[in-house]
Curated annotation (Swiss-Prot):
NCBIfam families (alphabetical): hrcA
UniProt keyword terms in alphabetical order: Repressor, Stress response, Transcription, Transcription regulation
Family: Belongs to the HrcA family.
GO biological process, any: negative regulation of DNA-templated transcription
Protein name from the UniProt record: Heat-inducible transcription repressor HrcA
Region (Disordered): 307-331
Keyword ATP-binding: no
InterPro entries membership: GAF-like_dom_sf (IPR029016), HrcA (IPR002571), HrcA_C (IPR021153), WH-like_DNA-bd_sf (IPR036388), WH_DNA-bd_sf (IPR036390), WHTH_transcript_rep_HrcA_IDD (IPR023120)
Record GO terms (molecular function): DNA binding
SUPFAM superfamilies: GAF domain-like, Winged helix' DNA-binding domain
């Protein structure tokens, strides 16, 4: 659309429809917006916008409502995302700072985002495939069983049972654990698996080489299992109060398909620029149950370059360097996402601001930087 006035008319229609969920007429627009032209001129502009696919007239005598194309143009070029107020930011910090651990923080974040937007909020736990090792402990639990407790850089804790024919020597096991913590801290789980295999091949660990391979397989499993990322959801009951949301049953079905949601929202958050917000509207979600919904999401906890390079020093003493690059992660890649799901007539500007603010807070939480503002 080359004409700036038509752009103003489209923005006015979208904003009014978001507020009222009623078809918008030219008389209303000229009365409520300073467009500087007559109602007849606005009516002609609306007809042109309809011809171009940005608006639709549900009934002959009714006003017009935005189409997906209209919403998309609004989100991409016309919507102004206003930062949250100081009071809202303080509220977010106050509510989330009372959490005791990562799980509690993510649960609180989902509840808070649902409360702010009045829509469904979804927060994913940091993916193990995008995490690095912070610490590991290996402890005996029976005569032929060990428990490996793995803590990642994002605070996630994973436990794995390691079955052995006989418990290893305590000194050797302690030495292996200490070396893993020294050499593999800050290294991706895939490369940690390679590092552990190389340790197990050394003479000093010959007696526990089978254990080392079992442990390496456990690290591989953690790195490969995207399903290990938990989803925290809040606000689903709010959908029932959205009187204009069509096809509620398919929408609830879509919310139950957590793997589908994970792929959709992860993909959307990863395609945004640093600190950005991604929006998928209706059919853009490629999800049948979300044809009448929009998804707003942002990544959080972005990785650093150190996380991708950490394997170099870990492998130096273990003769590695068959690093094909398959495990390389781009610096700044989000480790998880936070998002909001609501009707296509959602308040995009407010939702985008809220999602971005919560994502920033979670990034600061993972970085242990409580002083960073959630703007």
């Amino acid at each position: 659309m080359a004409q700036s006035r038509r752009m103003l008319v489209l923005r006015a229609v979208v904003e009014d429809y978001i507020r009222s969920q009623e078809p918008v007429g030219s008389t209303t627009l000229t009365r409520d917006h300073d467009l500087g032209v007559s109602s007849a001129t606005v009516r002609n502009d609306m007809a042109a916008l309809e011809d171009e696919g940005y608006l639709i007239q549900p009934h002959t005598s009714a006003g017009r409502v935005p189409t997906e194309k209209g919403y998309r143009y609004f989100v991409d070029r016309l919507a102004t995302v206003v930062p949250l107020s100081e009071a809202q930011r303080r509220g977010i910090n106050s509510f989330l700072s009372g959490s005791v651990n990562l799980q509690d923080t993510l649960q609180r974040a989902a509840r808070l985002l649902a409360q702010i937007t009045g829509q469904v909020a979804v927060v994913a736990a940091p993916s193990l495939s995008k995490s690095t090792l912070r610490h590991i402990e290996i402890v005996p639990v029976s005569i032929n069983t060990l428990l490996a407790v793995v803590i990642t850089d994002t605070g996630r804790v994973a436990q794995h049972i390691l079955n052995v024919t006989k418990l290893p020597d305590v000194t050797t096991l302690t030495h292996l654990t200490n070396e893993i913590n020294t050499q593999c801290s800050g290294v991706s789980l895939t490369r940690t698996a390679d590092c552990v295999r190389q340790m197990g091949a050394r003479k000093e660990y010959h007696a526990i080489s089978t254990l080392a391979e079992t442990l390496a397989q456990a690290f591989d499993g953690m790195a490969d299992d995207e399903r290990a990322s938990e989803l925290y959801m809040a606000g689903t009951s709010r959908l029932a109060h959205q009187r204009t949301v069509a096809d509620l049953a398919p929408l609830f079905d879509a919310l139950e398909e957590q793997v589908v949601l994970m792929k959709l929202m992860s993909s959307l958050s990863e395609t945004t620029q640093s600190d950005g917000v991604g929006v998928a509207i209706g059919s853009e979600t490629h999800t049948p149950g979300l044809l009448h919904a929009s998804v707003v999401t942002s990544g959080y906890g972005r990785t650093s370059a150190a996380a991708t390079d950490g394997a170099t020093h870990a492998a130096a003493s273990s003769q590695t360097e068959n690093q094909s690059g398959d495990d390389t992660r781009q610096a700044g890649e989000p480790v998880a996402f936070v998002g909001s799901i609501g009707p296509t007539h959602m308040d995009y500007a407010a939702t985008m601001a809220a999602v971005r603010a919560v994502a920033r807070y979670l990034t600061a939480f993972l970085a242990h930087d409580e002083g960073q503002p959630a703007d």
